[in-house]
Each structure stands twice: as structure tokens, then as C-alpha cells.
């Protein structure tokens, strides 16, 4: 059994007190939740502290909370902010764990079959396991997630039933524990000890939980009784503390057993017979032969190995669901009274709505042409109405709420005033002729003041050409695009703040929620090209990126002023006047937000060449205290020895060089 802690309260830690619009917004939202309001909207302008407001609401209502974000970059930023506000509670991160993902597909026009190909990020997989285990263990949990949260995850009941619970004094044979660990997909490896593995030394069993990468559990036996449970540093073996009870969660979210597997394979066989008869009656003999060959092979693998490539396509049979029933998702791991916060809801909710249709169109081709059984269609994301059925209470959060939110509720809480006194940026419209020379001049002015610049373009080609052009002029520039891996996007944002880059060029990634106070200029190229990227809502969001700096300004390069441009400028001017009046009344002088630069998510890296230095480790070294510097060097030395022990001499040599550089820097 899992001892779920339901008496833990959220502990908000902040040196700030709610000011401006925040106290009223917090009170209204809290009252709405306590009064049973199903849906509310927090209409908050950029830089007004919406995350801080929501944090106060979470503390007040004390409910497990899912914060839904529309992209991984913003999710990573929110994760860092909530961790800072709630250091004593469980703040988790749940996004797709694929660094690269090519879904299975078939293109009839060219008779091209594309096999599924993917690369899994181990760090994100760990964070996903941490999220689900926290939800089952405690009540004070905030999970920041992308739309990955509405994709299939496995039955939470099966996952919970497979948890191995261990207590000091418990009678259990050592070998029985080993069998339990293997049953929940842990792998025995006495030499390469890492997540999801265990090792055995006599009466001592060491277990590395799937949800952690720094601490392992040491279970010591005396005969057939657990004598002691210790938490140890996985790298050094140093004892961190003793535990009376531990719960070992499965190493995979997709748990099954022999009975379920037998029932599933029998069901798949029955469906295969029906589908083959259907295809043959329609004269689709090639499709029937293809389906029979592929499915028969999968069934053989499932019986012999308990697994096959693409097993997720049989998830309906594995879960015991009926045709058309929704899959289990992260939402099923939450208790029924959880709170949902949809960040940048005007983008996130349309994204949630579109997930099912896109997935269905691709899979229908696979079914029609004999690559998959019809049950594969039930391996899918949730439909919008299915997501709505999970919602207990929701707060839609946006500076520009969309039509969907307006249909759900008329309970709108406004938050326009910034506690910092910062004004919405000034907006200047300039002609397209000579825009490059003008833009470079503006960028150089910001560089002289140690400020940063965002430039947003309409196409990928334009962004790439602009990036190359600025690089040729010696400007430190980065191009933020969709091909960049999840955690690297967050790192690029951090590097911009640190001054490694002065300019960031993007298309659709420099909008909602990107929070960089050093940015004082946002340049919008082709602002008069009406469309999705240049409509009123998009322009207001883009303009908001310059609203966190007291020198914030926006330049729109356009030959005419469109209705969208005018509406965005009018709304910005309205908000600016409200803030000016508030500042005058309270004697506030606008000041740029001072925000600490921190690593949001630890990313494990490996150098491609032995001669490269671990700059990602050393980047903040000179800013550390002497004591912290020595601790970091000691830890890197441990990592170096561990890498050498695993015969990873390339990594060991790289760490050695980094350590030598650090010791030289401190004069050791």
C-alpha cells in the first residue's frame, strides 16, 4: 500500500507581497473556486505577475494542480518559477520525452511507408516518472505539463497495484523482492547502476528508482526480514539518511501481467480474423496479406517477449477498453478534485482540440491500407470533450483570451497593473525600405546598453537569412526554431540573459510567456502581412515581450497600418494609460524586473570531442563562493572517476580538463 499524504499544505515562499491588481485577482479566483465555479478567466497583461497570482490561489485552495502549457519552452520556464515559489512541495514537469519523433505513417500517393523512429530523452523520462509517483504519494503537487498530458499513459490502477512497498521489519525473502523488481520492469545490473536498475551484494539490495537520478535506496536484509532501509548518494555511495518506509514505483508507466497479456493477445487474434475477412470481401488481398503478416509477428513477440515494437497500437486490448473509449492519460493520475490552470489558453485550448483530428487522419491511412488493426485508432490523444469531462475546476489564463474560454464562462478577473510600475512598450511603425540597416542600428544601441533584442519574422527561410546576416556583422545572434530539442530551448533563453547572445530571431516562438526582462526591443518584420502570425492577438502577445523592461519599445516594420496593427496599438495604449495613472497615484517609478538567472532543469550532456571543455558546468563558476567551488570540483572528480570506471574515457578526460581549468582559476 502507498501511504498517500493528504495533510500536506502548499508553502508559498516569496519575498514579495501581492500588490496592484494582484490581491483582488487572488481573492476573486480563490472565492470562485471555493464557491464551486467550474471555470474562470484570469485576463492578465504581460508582466503583471500572473504566475505569482496563481501561486497564491494554489496555496489558498490547497488542491493538486495541473498547469497546462502549449509548448515545452514555456513549460520549462513555468516549472522553474513554481519550483522557486514552492521549494517545500512537489513541483513536477511532464512533457513529451522524445528528443526526436517520426510517427508511423503511410503515403498512398507514392506508396511510401514510413516506420516509426524516435529518440527518448532520459532526463525527461525521469521527470515524468517523478510526476506520476508524486501524484500517488502526496496531495501538495503541481505538475507543469504540455499537451503530452492528454496522450495515452497506461492504466493508473495497474501502475499503483504494481508499486512495491517496503518497510523496516517487513518479512520478505530477498529473492522474492528481486522477482517483484523484475516484474515491475526493473533490470538487474551489478556494474552499470542507473535509473530503473538494481544490484545485489549478498544481503544488500540497492535499487535506483525510475523517478530519480541522484539518490538510490539500499535495502539491508537480516535473514528474511528487512533490517534497514537507507537512502544513498548514487554516485559516491555516501549514506544520506535512513527510511522507515519506501514505495518503489514501476520503471514503466505501461504495466501489465500474464493474465492481461493472454486476454489481450486473444482479443487481437479475434479482431485480426474479423478484419481479414472484411478486407478479403472487399478484394483488398494485398492489404489483408500485409496485415496478417505484421500482426502475426507482433502477437508472437508479445507472447514470447511480453513486448513488441509498436505495442502502443494494441493499448486498447492491453487496457481492456471498448472501441472508442478514451485512453488513460496523466489526467487519470490526479484526484477528482484537482485544479486545472491553462496557461496562454487562447493558444493551448485550440491545440488541445486539434490533437485528436491530426492523429486520427494519420492512423486512418495505416488502418485502411493494412498496416494496422482498427483498434490502433484507439491509441490516441483525448478529444476536447473528453478533456472537459476530466475537468473539475479550471482557470484559463491569458492576456488575450480566445472565443472558447468566453463560451465556457463569463467570470473574468482582470489583472492589468504591474507591481513594478512597468509600462507597456512604446510602438513605432517604420517603413520596410531600409529596414535592415535601421534594425542593425537599433540592435547596436541595445548592445551598448547591455540590453537584448527579439526579432520576429514570418518564415523559416527569412529567419535563417537574417540570422546569417547578423552573424556576418559580428552580432551575437541565435535562431530559435522548432527543430531545437526541448531542454536546449530553455538553455538558449538562459544564454541570452547571460549575454552569450544579444539577439534572438524566431517565427512563432517569441510570443506567449517568454519571460526575459533584459529584452528592451522587439522588432516585428512584415507587421502588415495579415494572417495568423500578424493578427491582433498575436501582435499583442509579441508586443508584450518588451513589457518587462523599463526601456521597452517595439518597432513594427510595415508600409501600411492594418486593422490588426491598429487594434493591437490601441489596446497597448489603453493598458499603458491605466498603468501611468496607477504609477502617478502611488508615486511609482517604473523599474526593470530583476529576475535571477537559474538552471530550470538539469540537463545531462556529453561532449562530442575529448578536447571540449564542460562549459555548461563552468559557466557560473566564477560567481560561486569558495566553498561551493570546492564542492563542485569534488563532485566533478567523483563523476570523472565514475566515467573512467565505466570505461567512458572520453567523458572522463573532458571532466579532467574542466577540473584543471577550475583549479587554475581559483589558484589551487
UniProtKB/Swiss-Prot annotation:
InterPro entries hit by this protein: Helicase/UvrB_N, Helicase_ATP-bd, Helicase_C-like, P-loop_NTPase, UVR_dom, UVR_dom_sf, UvrB, UvrB_inter
Keywords: ATP-binding, Cytoplasm, DNA damage, DNA excision, DNA repair, Excision nuclease, Helicase, Hydrolase, Nucleotide-binding, SOS response
Domain annotation Helicase ATP-binding: ranges: 31-188
Domain UVR: 630-665
Span(s) of short sequence motif Beta-hairpin: 97-120
Presence of the UniProt keyword ATP-binding in the record: yes
Binding residue positions for ATP: 44-51
Domain of life: Bacteria
Major localisation: cytoplasm
Entry annotated with the keyword Iron-sulfur: no
Cellular component terms (Gene Ontology): cytoplasm; excinuclease repair complex
Ranges annotated as spanning the membrane: none
Entry's Gene Ontology BP terms: nucleotide-excision repair; SOS response
Single GO term (MF): helicase activity
Annotated Helicase C-terminal domain residues: 435-601
Subcellular locations according to the entry: Cytoplasm
Pfam families: Helicase_C, ResIII, UVR, UvrB, UvrB_inter
Job of this protein: The UvrABC repair system catalyzes the recognition and processing of DNA lesions. A damage recognition complex composed of 2 UvrA and 2 UvrB subunits scans DNA for abnormalities. Upon binding of the UvrA(2)B(2) complex to a putative damaged site, the DNA wraps around one UvrB monomer. DNA wrap is dependent on ATP binding by UvrB and probably causes local melting of the DNA helix, facilitating insertion of UvrB beta-hairpin between the DNA strands. Then UvrB probes one DNA strand for the presence of a lesion.
Quaternary structure note: Forms a heterotetramer with UvrA during the search for lesions. Interacts with UvrC in an incision complex.
Family: Belongs to the UvrB family.
UniProt domain comment: The beta-hairpin motif is involved in DNA binding.
Name of the protein in question: UvrABC system protein B
Source organism: Levilactobacillus brevis (strain ATCC 367 / BCRC 12310 / CIP 105137 / JCM 1170 / LMG 11437 / NCIMB 947 / NCTC 947)
Gene: uvrB
Amino acid at each position: 500500500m502507498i501511504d498517500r499524504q493528504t495533510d500536506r499544505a502548499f508553502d508559498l515562499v516569496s519575498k514579495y507581497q501581492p500588490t496592484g491588481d494582484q490581491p483582488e485577482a487572488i481573492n476573486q479566483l480563490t472565492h470562485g473556486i471555493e464557491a464551486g465555479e467550474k471555470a474562470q478567466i484570469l485576463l492578465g497583461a504581460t508582466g503583471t505577475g500572473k504566475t505569482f497570482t496563481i501561486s497564491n490561489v494554489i496555496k489558498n485552495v490547497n488542491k493538486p494542480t495541473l498547469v497546462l502549457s502549449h509548448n515545452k519552452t514555456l513549460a520549462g520556464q513555468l516549472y522553474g518559477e513554481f519550483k522557486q515559489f514552492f521549494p517545500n512541495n512537489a513541483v513536477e514537469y511532464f512533457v513529451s520525452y522524445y528528443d526526436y519523433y517520426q510517427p508511423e505513417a503511410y503515403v498512398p500517393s507514392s506508396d511510401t511507408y514510413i516506420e516509426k523512429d524516435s529518440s527518448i530523452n532520459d532526463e525527461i523520462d525521469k521527470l515524468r516518472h517523478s510526476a506520476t509517483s508524486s501524484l500517488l504519494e502526496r496531495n501538495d503537487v503541481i505538475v507543469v505539463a504540455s499537451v503530452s498530458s492528454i496522450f495515452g499513459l497506461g492504466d493508473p490502477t495497474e501502475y499503483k497495484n504494481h508499486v512495491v512497498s517496503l518497510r523496516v521489519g517487513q518479512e520478505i525473502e530477498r529473492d522474492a523482492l528481486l522477482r517483484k523488481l523484475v516484474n515491475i520492469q526493473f533490470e538487474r545490473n551489478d556494474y552499470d547502476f542507473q535509473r530503473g536498475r538494481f544490484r545485489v551484494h549478498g544481503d544488500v539490495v540497492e535499487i535506483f528508482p525510475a523517478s530519480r537520478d541522484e539518490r538510490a535506496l539500499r535495502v539491508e536484509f537480516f535473514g528474511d526480514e528487512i533490517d534497514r532501509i537507507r537512502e544513498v548518494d548514487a554516485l559516491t555511495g555516501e549514506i544520506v539518511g535512513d527510511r522507515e518506509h519506501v514505495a518503489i514505483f514501476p520503471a514503466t508507466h505501461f504495466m501489465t501481467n500474464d493474465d492481461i497479456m493472454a486476454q489481450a493477445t486473444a482479443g487481437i487474434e479475434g479482431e485480426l480474423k474479423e478484419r481479414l475477412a472484411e478486407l478479403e470481401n472487399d478484394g483488398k488481398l494485398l492489404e489483408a496479406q500485409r496485415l496478417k503478416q505484421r500482426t502475426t509477428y507482433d502477437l508472437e513477440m508479445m507472447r514470447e517477449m511480453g513486448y513488441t515494437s509498436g505495442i502502443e497500437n494494441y493499448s486498447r486490448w492491453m487496457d481492456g477498453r471498448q472501441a472508442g473509449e478514451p485512453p488513460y492519460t496523466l489526467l487519470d493520475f490526479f484526484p477528482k478534485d484537482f485544479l486545472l490552470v491553462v496557461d496562454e489558453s487562447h493558444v493551448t485550448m485550440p491545440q488541445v482540440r486539434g490533437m485528436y483530428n491530426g492523429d486520427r487522419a494519420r492512423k486512418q491511412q495505416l488502418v485502411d491500407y493494412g498496416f494496422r488493426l482498427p483498434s490502433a485508432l484507439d491509441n490516441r490523444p483525448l478529444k476536447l470533450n473528453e478533456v472537459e469531462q476530466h475537468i473539475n475546476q479550471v482557470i484559463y489564463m491569458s492576456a488575450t483570451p480566445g472565443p472558447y474560454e468566453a463560451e465556457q464562462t463569463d467570470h473574468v478577473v482582470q489583472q492589468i497593473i504591474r507591481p513594478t510600475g512597468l509600462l507597456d512598450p512604446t510602438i513605432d511603425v517604420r517603413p520596410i525600405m531600409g529596414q535592415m540597416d535601421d534594425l542593425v542600428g537599433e540592435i547596436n544601441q541595445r548592445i551598448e546598453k547591455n540590453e537584448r533584442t527579439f526579432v520576429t519574422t514570418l518564415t523559416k527561410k527569412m529567419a535563417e537569412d537574417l540570422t546569417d546576416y547578423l552573424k556576418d556583422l559580428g552580432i551575437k545572434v541565435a535562431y530559435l526554431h522548432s527543430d531545437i530539442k526541448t531542454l536546449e530551448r530553455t538553455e538558449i533563453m538562459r544564454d541570452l540573459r547571460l549575454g552569450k547572445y544579444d539577439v534572438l530571431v524566431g517565427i512563432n516562438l517569441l510570443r506567449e510567456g517568454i519571460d526575459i526582462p533584459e529584452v528592451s526591443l522587439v522588432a516585428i518584420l512584415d507587421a502588415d502581412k495579415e494572417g495568423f502570425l500578424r493578427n491582433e492577438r498575436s501582435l499583442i502577445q509579441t508586443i508584450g515581450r518588451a513589457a518587462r523592461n523599463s526601456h521597452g519599445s517595439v518597432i513594427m516594420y510595415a508600409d501600411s497600418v492594418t486593422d490588426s496593427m491598429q487594434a493591437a496599438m490601441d489596446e497597448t495604449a489603453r493598458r499603458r494609460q491605466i498603468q501611468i495613472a496607477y504609477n502617478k497615484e502611488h508615486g511609482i517609478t517604473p523599474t526593470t524586473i530583476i529576475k535571477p538567472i537559474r538552471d530550470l532543469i538539469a540537463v545531462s550532456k556529453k561532449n562530442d570531442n575529448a578536447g571540449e571543455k564542460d562549459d555548461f558546468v563552468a559557466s557560473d563558476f566564477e560567481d560561486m563562493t569558495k566553498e561551493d567551488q570546492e564542492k563542485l570540483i569534488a563532485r566533478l572528480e567523483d563523476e570523472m572517476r565514475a566515467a573512467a570506471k565505466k570505461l567512458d574515457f572520453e567523458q572522463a578526460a573532458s571532466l579532467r580538463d574542466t577540473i584543471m581549468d577550475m583549479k587554475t582559476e581559483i589558484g589551487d
